[in-house]
């Protein structure tokens, strides 16, 4: 088991997400006074260990420590309580209550959509949790079924909203740049996709998408890519399913308004959903049905929505004209505003350009063809979440690790340029009078298009050697050079056997062995016989 700090031990992983891994852990000793819940030794908790790239960001660590009190005091019956925060070296972890139950995304995948009444009551409890967090100035910004856990108590399931701390930390400047959004593309609000200031209305928009998915089984906006999904959020209207009652569709339509000022507050959303659940039920009376049909009057927007930390009050327009702040009187010793010096009679080189008429290139709000797409950063972030690593074949000739070193061609040294002869320019200083010259700006160089180096030419390949012809056997199978193989040995044995057999059959060797004479006696008798035979031949020839 892996220790986390000095008070917790990780036992087994429960899930893995985009920001870290959730572990089942056990408390070793009672937590200190800085923790929201002291706990008891042996108690089981859930710990979310953030990824190393988050823990190595100094901005996130400072926000982690600075907002410790905000996360620890965020308590509600429908919010997973953060018990403690652990910061140790390269480790950042959130200690939370362990919820024994599936998340809402898994439940919908296994059991299908909910009834309109059940969906309205479940979303009302989530809206209660959002209202409590908005009252504390905390905006979730990533509301989706995967961040809603279902706690089973007494045969009933209670939704528990989690990952508030992760959404809070994601606001760090080290992660969230200008014109980027934090969230999942299928559940992101239009103002988040456009990089506009965000308020608590983004959570109400996410609650509307969640409610739509609870009764239909899928989000209202989809597409084959992140660009299509974002385009649907910005321009398309959700389609009403035939199974959604009129009062419930009124709530969904108000939550999914493109203008955040037209969306209801989380508190009014919870109140309206409970009225709708009573009016569309089987045992609803006429008063409840009438109240549900007039639910639009209850969905009033929030007069003071919670602002996302770090969001500017107004979007920055890079093409807007420069504005001059008015002079305001301040206390003694305050810094004076910038003053314009009076004209001295010399020609003033600074000129005010006439305003560009609308519709012309360079007009405010109209980007040139080379300007980046306003959604470029959002699409890159969404694409990085959804793309997987692709493996493709690499030509060995283009592999820098296998490329042969090339000899660099020596170039002749360049001769230094000689400065033109002439009188040295007079520098303004002590020996020369200073003259006021008009300020001249160099003509801007036209932007050269980016050119890529051509691919290296393929190196000439050496001619391949012709393959060696196969070894051919001799026509005479008995010819074996040196008799150094098994075949030669067998032939030799056969020849010796045949020669011995011929000697045995054609020579008097059998008779000699049968008579028992010695080898020398047999040889002497044979020699005597041959001598007598030759002598007889000679005597008969002489007679």
From Swiss-Prot:
Q: Region annotation Disordered: residue ranges?
A: 303-480
Note the Pfam families from the entry.
Answer: Pkinase
Regions of biased composition (Pro residues) lie at: 352-361, 452-461
**Which of UniProt's keywords are assigned here?**
ATP-binding, Kinase, Nucleotide-binding, Phosphoprotein, Serine/threonine-protein kinase, Transferase
Q: Which residues form the active site?
A: 142 (proton acceptor)
One of the entry's Gene Ontology molecular-function terms is: protein serine/threonine kinase activity
Residues annotated as binding ATP are: 14-22, 48
- Which family does the UniProt entry place this protein in? Belongs to the protein kinase superfamily. Ser/Thr protein kinase family.
Name the record gives this protein: Serine/threonine-protein kinase PkaA
Name of the coding gene: pkaA
